[in-house]
A protein has these predicted regions:
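N-terminal signal peptide c-region/cleavage motif recognized by signal peptidases
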Residues: 3-5
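Hydrophobic ligand-binding cavity/cleft-lining segments
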Residues: 10-150
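A short hydrophobic beta-strand element
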Residues: 139-141, 166-174, 205-207
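Hydrophobic-ligand binding "helix-grip"
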Residues: 151-152, 156-193
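Surface-exposed amphipathic alpha-helical segments
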Residues: 223-243
């Protein structure tokens, strides 16, 4: 299911920041993870692609308290048509995020992480619209999104997409403060990115999240765990939908 040794050179070229141990783990287990606290974004696992600079730029101005990175090596999805279009529309089918679950150690059971997720016509009117699927991959596109987060409740984000000949990306950033009893994460201080890069026989899926949070939530919540859960859930959602 995972990469074979013949793909090693491609991986090393695509992700030169990987150590030998990380490369071996990625080949054998299919994924690796990394996090930092109170450090700038490192993009340690970010693969080379035409969109990698866009991913970096999306975090400009952020001074994160916690950063999580994940990298998956997956089989290439089977599709009768354009693979990049299939990946792109999978990421644009934002309503399918509704009801995604994670295992809560605190409650020792499965919980819904994101619910009532939908695209909107504009940030002002906030009318629900159908998933804005496309027939070709544009270079850039964005639309507002509503979602209910298990901890932060009803929230508003902007979803941004980029397309290129070798990759597609999907980003989310909050457009209003997120509340945990009181506002704890200011507008645009929570940012996610997924980057999908087809290889010859596999698919690289990179994900990262950076959060700049207030003192209250940092005292009450272990940020690396909380936001690792969210970026992994986004990646798992894509994988489930794409395959």
């Amino acid at each position: 299911m995972w990469a074979n040794p013949s793909s090693a050179q491609t991986l090393q070229e695509r992700v030169p920041g990987l150590s030998a141990d990380e490369l071996q783990q990625l080949r054998s287990e299919g994924s690796i993870r990394f996090h930092t606290e109170d450090q700038p974004m490192q993009f340690r696992y970010l693969p080379h692609s035409s969109l990698s600079a866009r991913v970096r730029d999306s975090f400009r101005g952020l001074e994160p308290n916690a950063v999580n990175e994940v990298l998956y090596l997956l089989p290439k999805p089977h599709t009768d048509g354009d693979l990049l279009l299939h990946i792109y529309n999978t990421l644009r089918a934002i309503s399918t995020l509704s009801g995604v679950r994670y295992h809560s150690g605190h409650y020792d059971r499965e919980r819904v992480l994101f619910d009532d997720v939908y695209a909107m016509d504009s940030p002002r009117s906030r009318n629900r619209i159908d998933d804005p699927l496309v027939t070709r991959v544009p270079r850039e596109s964005s639309f507002p999104v509503h979602l209910v987060d298990a901890n932060f409740g009803s929230s508003y984000f902007e979803a941004t997409y980029y397309g290129a000949g070798d990759a597609v990306s999907f980003g989310l950033r909050n457009t209003q403060s997120l509340t945990y009893i009181i506002p704890v994460i200011r507008s645009e201080r929570l940012r996610f990115q997924l980057l999908a890069i087809p290889l010859e026989e596999e698919l690289l899926l990179y994900g990262t999240v950076g959060v700049e949070a207030g003192r209250l939530i940092r005292r009450q919540v272990h940020l690396p765990s909380a936001f690792r859960r969210r970026i992994e859930t986004l990646a798992d959602w894509f994988i489930e939908q794409a395959y």
